[in-house]
Swiss-Prot record:
Sequence similarity: Belongs to the GHMP kinase family. Homoserine kinase subfamily.
Transmembrane segments: none
UniProt keyword Cytoplasm, yes or no: yes
Species name: Buchnera aphidicola subsp. Cinara cedri (strain Cc)
Gene giving rise to this polypeptide: thrB
Protein name as catalogued: Homoserine kinase
Higher taxonomy: Bacteria, Pseudomonadati, Pseudomonadota, Gammaproteobacteria, Enterobacterales
Database matches in Gene3D superfamilies: 3.30.230.10, GHMP kinase, C-terminal domain
Principal location: cytoplasm
Amino acid sequence: MIKIYAPASIGNVGVGFDILGIAIKPIDKTLLGDCISIKPSKKFQLKNHGNFSKQLPVNIKENIIWKAWKYFNKKAKKKKTVKIVLEKNMPIGSGLGSSASSIVACVIALNKFYKTKLSKTKLLKIMGKLEGIISGEVHYDNVAPCYLGGLQLITNDQKNITQKLPIFTDWLWVIAWPGVTLSTSQARNILPLKYKKKTCIHNSRNLATFIHALYTKQSELAIRYMKDIIAEPYRIPLIPKFLISKKKIIELGALTCNISGSGPTLFSVCPNISIAKKVKIWLKKNYMENQTGFVHICKIDQSGARKMEKKNEII
């Protein structure tokens, strides 16, 4: 049996709409990511387990894992009957790369099971294509960091789709999912089709300065330019508690606060564990809509997707 784990990810990272993404892992070692197990079978089987498996479609052909299996068969020019078990640890429509986590884990597991030895670039293209089935267009800001780890800059160059960027390892990332879902397509459709030239220039300046600050190790400069002027202003109405939460946790000492991906998860960057714990406590009391919501203090997951032991230990 082959078992693969793929971590949660933050798309956009505030300043990089559709071109930045970062993989994360809770410091308490909670598995914030999906797992895929594959073994031989006389007929195709797909079993769903995990805390959020009930969110998955009842019709097997609507499940992204079934679509991944069909698409991979076509690309690999092989067809094998397998039993796939999806451990769904990520809520759908959370803004944490839930679909990317399932897709990445499944594609890697299939590649290993079939022994096709497809290159990382070819695998990434398959992942992006499958992600596009869900969101409506191919994009890599979740699948790339989920697969490769760290902070990824999406170039969309077909020979070199993504580049890994340096990131401050002492930052702590507090993520809070309120327990409700927000459709990625809905969050994308609310955005304008065109932006003013002034806005485009402003955003280009922010992104360029942020990346420059990463390479020159100027953390304060990076934080100042880690702003979202492309999506956040339009998505705020979809996330009623976001603005008040952002104001409060910055008062508590967080360095910044932004929407994770399409939302409704928010993320904040904290300079130390003391402030991160204060932010976590406040968000748990004030940002949650129900008991299924969660808050985690995270660090960067530099490894990305990887094999797992039988006892859910990450290799």
